Amino acid sequence: NKKISDMRAELKKRHNADWSKEMQRFTTKRNNKVDDYIQKATKMVIDFCKENNIDTLVCGYNTGWKQESDMGKRVNQKFVDIPHASIVWRLSYKCETAGILFKTPEESFTSGTSFLDGEEPIKENYDKSRRVHRGLFVTKKGEEINADVNGSYQIMKKAFPNAFADGIVGAGSHPIVVNIPL
């Protein structure tokens, strides 16, 4: 985006034009790289699911969430360019082909409610201040949990409300890191 913005400003100044063949080539090349990466990344996810007998994939989704982002001009330029909907669509398609159930629950209020405290991910329980640092969430009991792990469990709870009805020992306290080489 920054490169295109610079090219457009220069073109406007010199030739009073908005678009050029060079900008089109640059955009096409970038889009092809992004599509290639999405293809490879989603294939890795599906292959991982198959190898580990995972029959359901859950991916939280908020409609229009990038349009309301306010992270500053530069960060917004980079963030809005990430084709999240394309990734979700590609995962959905590949899951269907592989016989894997794909669910996309709405993910609002999952990052500010506590899984370990048994809170429902609803507006009444939402408290943004418990996310104390980037990547760290503190429960009402004072326990610390990785914020992404907490949010993921809450998204799973939205997709499958009875998933943790029998409890889960040490949930979120001992996450497993899975490295997938690119």
In which residue ranges do the predicted regions lie?
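Substrate-contacting helices/loops that form the catalytic groove of nucleic-acid
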Residues: 1-85, 165-182
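Positively charged, low-complexity nucleic-acid-binding target-recognition regions
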Residues: 76-182
